[in-house]
Every structure is written in C-alpha cells, then in structure tokens.
A protein has these predicted regions:
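Short loop/turn motifs that initiate or flank beta-strands
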Residues: 1-203
Length: 203
C-alpha cells in the first residue's frame, strides 16, 4: 500500500519584536537616582494580536538625582515576559524613557515665642522639616535658615507671624526643595498685655 500522509521536519522561528516608546515616569525628590522598574511600560511592535507578551526591565535609574538635571531614565535588563514570550525575540536589552523629579516639600516651622508688651524682641528660631533621607540643613548652603517677624516694636499686644527664610526664599522652589511655611507660623509670636497696678491689663 502507498501511504497517503507523510511527515517531515518543521520549525517555527521566533518573531522579532521591537520596542516602542517608553512611558514616562516621575517621582518626588528623594536624594537618589532610583527609579521604579515595575513601572516600565513600552509598546511592542510586530506582536500578534491576542498573544500574551510584554516587555519588563530588571532595573531603572535616573540620569541624575537632582530636580533640575533629571530628564531620563535608563532601564537595563529588558526582556520579554508572558505566556507567549517564547515565540518572540527582542534585540534590545536596554531602553531609555523620559523621567522627571519634582521638588520635595520642606516646611519651615517657627518656634513659638511669648513676651510681655514693652519687652525687647526675642531671637526667632525654628526648624526645617521634610529633608530626604541622609540630608539635613547643610544642603541649604551658606545662607542657612533664619526666622524673623515683621514686628518692629512690642507695644501692641496680639499674635503675630514669624517667617522662615532660606537666603531670600520664603515660599517657592529652592534647588530640590519647595519651601513652605508651617500653618502655625502665622501666630507664632505672642505679645501679652502688661499688668497694671490693681491687676488691670494694659490694652
């Protein structure tokens, strides 16, 4: 008899894919170049519709840790993932995408000061809160941190504001930080009425 079927060797080669645009990332300044590899997203050109295949990255790092200079994220160890990944090849093993770093909030908090009317103005002090790990007031430069009040004399009782200042900046972006005033600064300086003979208070 003559067989009406036959078998022969056959192979299916992997379909070549190329990476498309990489989705941009952003983060708040933390003093490092670390980026989130789990957020890596890139379109794959030439994949069969319906197949389960994506690209993933083993690592991610910004090109610079500073707000003003960070504009790119490098992704090493790019590879295919998914149930159908074995049917595809990807020539690229690295990728780049846009990346931005936004300023970190740095809150200037004035220490509460209280005096009796007519007494000399006190020395105003306070602290800066919100530094990235490993950083402190030394990153503010030679200008340092100062606090001041607009009060020029102490004859009128009441609550007054105290403003933190780094150089000339009281509210706005300074390097990697966005300078903000603590809510309590608006009433951080209190002038109490002086007592008069007979237990009365001066107005």
């Amino acid at each position: 008899t003559i067989a009406d079927t036959a078998q022969g060797a056959g192979t299916i080669t992997q379909r070549a894919l190329t990476l498309g645009a990489v989705t941009a990332q952003t983060k708040t300044y933390d003093g490092t170049t670390a980026a989130d590899a789990s957020k890596f997203r890139a379109a794959l050109t030439n994949a069969i519709a319906g197949d389960s295949v994506t690209a993933a990255a083993a690592g991610a790092a910004y090109n610079d840790k500073n707000v003003a200079r960070a504009n790119r994220i490098d992704y090493p160890g790019v590879a295919l993932r998914g149930a159908d990944a074995g049917n595809y090849s990807l020539a690229a093993t690295t990728a780049q995408g846009a990346g931005t770093i936004t300023p970190r909030d740095l809150t200037l908090t004035a220490d509460a000061k209280k005096i009796v009317q007519g007494e000399p103005l006190p020395s105003f002090t306070g602290r800066a809160e919100g530094f990235a790990d490993g950083e402190d007031a030394s990153v503010l430069g030679a200008d340092g941190l100062t606090f001041e009040s607009t009060v020029k004399n102490t004859e009128t009782p009441g609550s007054y504001g105290v403003t933190g200042r780094i150089g000339s900046v009281t509210d706005g972006v300074l390097g990697n930080y966005r300078i903000r005033q603590a809510t309590g600064n608006a009433t951080a300086f209190t002038i109490h009425a002086a007592a008069l003979p007979g237990g009365l208070l001066a107005s």
